From Swiss-Prot:
<dbReference type="GO" id="GO:0036430">
    <property type="term" value="F:CMP kinase activity"/>
</dbReference>
<protein>
    <recommendedName>
        <fullName>Cytidylate kinase</fullName>
        <ecNumber>2.7.4.25</ecNumber>
    </recommendedName>
</protein>
<dbReference type="GO" id="GO:0005524">
    <property type="term" value="F:ATP binding"/>
</dbReference>
<comment type="similarity">
    <text>Belongs to the cytidylate kinase family. Type 1 subfamily.</text>
</comment>
<keyword id="KW-0963">Cytoplasm</keyword>
<dbReference type="GO" id="GO:0015949">
    <property type="term" value="P:nucleobase-containing small molecule interconversion"/>
</dbReference>
<keyword id="KW-0067">ATP-binding</keyword>
<feature type="binding site">
    <location>
        <begin position="12"/>
        <end position="20"/>
    </location>
    <ligand>
        <name>ATP</name>
    </ligand>
</feature>
<dbReference type="InterPro" id="IPR027417">
    <property type="entry name" value="P-loop_NTPase"/>
</dbReference>
<dbReference type="GO" id="GO:0006220">
    <property type="term" value="P:pyrimidine nucleotide metabolic process"/>
</dbReference>
<dbReference type="InterPro" id="IPR011994">
    <property type="entry name" value="Cytidylate_kinase_dom"/>
</dbReference>
<dbReference type="GO" id="GO:0005829">
    <property type="term" value="C:cytosol"/>
</dbReference>
<keyword id="KW-0418">Kinase</keyword>
<dbReference type="GO" id="GO:0036431">
    <property type="term" value="F:dCMP kinase activity"/>
</dbReference>
<keyword id="KW-0808">Transferase</keyword>
<dbReference type="Pfam" id="PF02224">
    <property type="entry name" value="Cytidylate_kin"/>
</dbReference>
<keyword id="KW-0547">Nucleotide-binding</keyword>
């Protein structure tokens, strides 16, 4: 880990467009990328595969401490590797996503994964995608962005994303799950989903992803004095 490597944190709720924004910024700046949400999904998947009780913090903590996860950039996409296996598609199912939100609420699990996430900080810089990147994981990050959107818009985006991957989804159920997840994430005792005090807050509800990327890149370059 290089303590001097700059970090740009992108926080926000599920479906706001963080993943697309982070990939675009990482490519534009040629920086490393951390999808912290993927780490929690990988943990959720590992727990499901090993039939670990996802309601047991004691059972989950050691799995989190020794989680073998890597991110590999390949053909413009980020491959998520768990114990040598590409699980990029498997971790994006709604069941795994909902499980990830539940396991993320445990303090010991977050502590174990916190150390792992900070290990991704390397030169020339890191784009960190998550929910508490700017408030907990990288509080010293020079650039912090909080990306939001209405729950209805996020449900629509998620439905299209899942349909493109061949999954059958119900909009009302998806919207309900997103609202429930928002409530858990915003009101949990440990690292709730809130913008950092010094974050730029972007509401992408009525914005194209191209507009969001342009605003975020211009803001980051200005803050970091990048050409």
């Amino acid at each position: 880990m290089t303590a001097t490597a700059p970090v740009i944190t992108i926080d926000g709720p599920s479906g706001a467009g963080k993943g697309t924004l982070c990939k675009a910024m990482a490519e534009a700046l040629q920086w490393h990328l951390l999808d912290s949400g993927a780490i929690y999904r990988v943990l959720a998947l590992a727990a499901l595969h090993h039939q670990v009780d996802i309601s047991s913090e004691e059972a989950l903590a050691p799995i989190a401490a020794h989680l073998d996860v890597r991110f590999i950039s390949h053909s413009g996409e980020i491959e998520v590797i768990l114990e040598g296996e590409n699980v990029s598609t498997e971790i994006r199912t709604q069941d795994v996503s909902n499980t990830a939100s539940r396991v993320a609420a445990f303090p010991r699990v977050r502590e174990a994964l916190l150390r792992r996430q900070r290990g991704f900080r390397e030169l020339p810089g890191l784009i960190a995608d998550g929910r508490d990147m700017g408030t907990v994981v990288f509080p010293d990050a020079p650039v912090k962005i909080f990306l939001d959107a209405s729950s209805e818009e996020r449900a629509s985006r998620r439905m299209l994303q899942l349909q493109e991957k061949g999954f059958s989804v119900n909009f009302e159920r998806l919207l309900s799950e997103i609202k429930e997840r928002d409530d858990r994430d915003r009101n949990r005792a440990i690292a709730p989903l809130v913008p950092a005090a010094d974050a730029l807050v972007l509401d992408s509800t009525t914005m194209s992803i191209e507009q969001v990327i342009e605003i975020a890149l211009n803001y980051a370059r200005e803050k970091l004095a990048l050409v």
